[in-house]
């Protein structure tokens, strides 16, 4: 199991991205992932690629439908070339409200649209590598023009691993059919991964005559830890609040269903609509907390991760942002406990 680092998005993180990439690589992390919330997911990786040599660099979630496949293809191509083959493209759909109201882009049949988006990416990359014509015509996307002036040309590592980030079974099936990896949402349990995610990926792989082991499973894990009891208690309540937020969202009710906790989701959803944010964490019991998070001392996090994910997850990051010069001793201890 690989241990990765997740990049935070607070403060002036972009200005220190070169230092962050070197620090993550020096500590022994296998990969460094960006997400797309307050900032662009790709730009930090260009800086990281120039500052590092071995660590894998990827977008855990870059929003697909806010961009044309051509735009994503070009950016990914350049990052793959710049990093000498270390780039991993992770895509997500987001939800309808954000795509239509924040990005002002179309939304319909997201799984079918994402499937075609992936096929379009690979057609574009094929045109880049062969310097041949581009002929992709689908239901949602049409790319039929590529002249030498606009073609970046072949690169040394043209095979770009593509992951999908998702929660429900349709996207997991799509990953099994077409992709090299699937990012399991941080709000999960081993039981949910075992009973819902893996069978869906296996079904998608079966339909495409692929093997399940061709698909890497990655995730971020909620972790309750600390150098003392006070810090651990503080983190426990923080994780409890985060879980209550995710559990209130209907999109994630399938995770609760794996444990027979559907009523908890409905109750939290009602409280969220009533803006009872401060009262919501109390609904998450210690049993639920144990299902969705691990609790361990820093030097025991590695064994706890292996016990939880062995045979289920191939690579994992902690649901904590990695920032150099902040908690360096903690991160060194965690990496050593895993490796």
Could you tell me what each predicted segment is?
Residues 1-339:
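Active-site-adjacent structural elements that line small-molecule/cofactor binding pockets in enzymes
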């Amino acid at each position: 199991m690989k241990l990765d680092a997740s990049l935070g998005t607070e403060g002036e993180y972009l200005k220190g991205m070169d230092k962050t990439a070197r620090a993550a690589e020096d500590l022994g992390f296998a990969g460094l992932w960006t997400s797309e919330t307050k900032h662009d997911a790709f730009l930090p990786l260009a800086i990281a690629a120039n500052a590092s040599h071995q660590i894998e660099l990827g977008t855990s979630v870059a929003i697909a439908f806010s961009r044309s496949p051509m735009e994503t293809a070009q950016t990914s191509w350049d990052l793959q070339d710049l990093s000498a083959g270390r780039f991993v493209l992770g895509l997500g759909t987001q939800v309808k409200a954000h795509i239509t109201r924040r990005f002002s882009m179309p939304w319909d049949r997201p799984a079918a649209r994402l499937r075609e988006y992936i096929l379009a990416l690979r057609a574009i990359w094929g045109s880049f590598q062969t310097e041949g014509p581009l002929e992709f015509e689908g239901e949602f996307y049409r790319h039929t023009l590529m002249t030498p002036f606009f073609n970046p040309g072949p690169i040394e590592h043209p095979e770009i691993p593509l992951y999908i980030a998702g929660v429900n079974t349709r996207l997991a099936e799509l990953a099994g059919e077409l992709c090299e990896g699937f990012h399991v949402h941080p709000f999960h349990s081993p039981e949910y991964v075992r009973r819902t995610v893996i069978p869906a990926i296996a079904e998608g792989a079966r339909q495409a005559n692929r093997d399940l082991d061709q698909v890497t499973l990655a995730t971020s894990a909620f972790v309750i830890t600390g150098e003392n009891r006070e810090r651990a208690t503080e983190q426990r309540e923080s994780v409890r609040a985060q879980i209550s937020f995710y559990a209130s969202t209907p999109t994630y009710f399938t995770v609760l269903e794996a444990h027979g906790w559907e009523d908890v989701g409905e109750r939290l959803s009602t409280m969220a609509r009533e803006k009872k944010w401060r009262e919501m964490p109390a609904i998450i019991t210690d049993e639920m907390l144990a299902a969705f998070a691990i609790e361990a001392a820093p030097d025991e996090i590695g064994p706890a991760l292996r016990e939880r994910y062995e045979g289920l997850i191939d690579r994992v990051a902690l649901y904590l942002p990695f920032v150099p010069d902040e908690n360096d001793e903690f991160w060194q201890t965690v990496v050593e406990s895993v490796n």
